[in-house]
Amino acid sequence: MTTARLKNSAIVGGVASALILAGAAITAAQAKTVKVELTAKEVTAPSDNEGHTFLAWTYNGQIPGPLIRATEGDTIEFTLKNDAANKKSHSIDMHSMRTDVLTNFASIKPGETKTFSYVPDHAGVFFYHCGSDPMIQHISRGMIGAVIVDPKDPDAMPKADREYVLIEHQMFDNPEDVDGMMANKWKHDAFNAVPFQYDPVHDEHATQTLEAKPGERVRIYLVNAGPNEFSGFHPIAGIWDRVYPSGNPKNVLVGMQNYTLAPGDAATFDLISPTEGANALVNHSMRAALSGAIAIVMFSNKADPSMGHGDKILVR
């Protein structure tokens, strides 16, 4: 190699290295810290649309717990508190995290606090729940939630016009009956903890539906919290435009009528309706659907613009 070529090679290499370093610096600068605080609370919560209640175990007094959202590469600083007024030990199991189960996911007693941080390195939608013994009871009584990790590449998926989070789980008649839970004697299957919460067709006491306009891309994040049943997720009168198993943009299926999630699994579903009218999102296991796992999406040119955005992504 001549001296001139050597100099040119060095210059090109130096520029390339500088660009790589600059890109790394930009990526580091874009990454942010997301602080999450959850408090385990044993409270009274609604069990249907008519005002009946049960003694629930929750995160922050809500079922599901708060939606946790970050971008791939962010740092999540997490704190779990077990309210001193509680009677039980509680914990966290985050499916978006790779860690030591014996430390970060260990139970804490009433009045105790646990903190840790992690960097979510896989984009997608993930389940979080209490892992304390008996886990089946902690899940069924309400200690469930969702984590959305958005891809760091904003163009990795088509842009959604609206987003909704649905967390499906079985509800048991007696929340103290662990043997009944193990025997799978559930009474209701519900989206976001209230049977038929978004279905005034099957429950006259239901007061809300999900909303969108025709032609909009509606993105549904479904978490199957179980604790026991699979979910065959189908949009009646529609077809899933795209399905992303685990919500990862690298996993994409097109034109699906139904997609099945195991207990503890999650996926992202895109739905587009060309016309006004209704689609019914169901677990196509009829026992599950007819005991509560139905959510109506109303497609209307007059759809509420706030629905599917901000605090109306997880509609309570």
Role assignments for model-derived ranges:
Residues R162-P214:
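Acidic-aromatic/histidine active-site loop/patch
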Residues V34-T39, V43-I148, N228-L261, N279-M298:
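Histidine- and aromatic-enriched segments that form or immediately flank copper-ligand environments
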Residues A28-A31:
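Boundary at the C-terminal end of the N-terminal hydrophobic targeting segment
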Residues T33, E42, S140-P175, S246, ...:
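Extracytoplasmic/periplasmic copper-protein system
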Residues G13-A24:
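Bacterial N-terminal signal peptides
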Residues I63-I76, D203-R217:
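Short, glycine/small-residue-enriched coil/turn segments at secondary-structure junctions
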Residues T2-V15:
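Bacterial N-terminal signal peptides that target proteins for export
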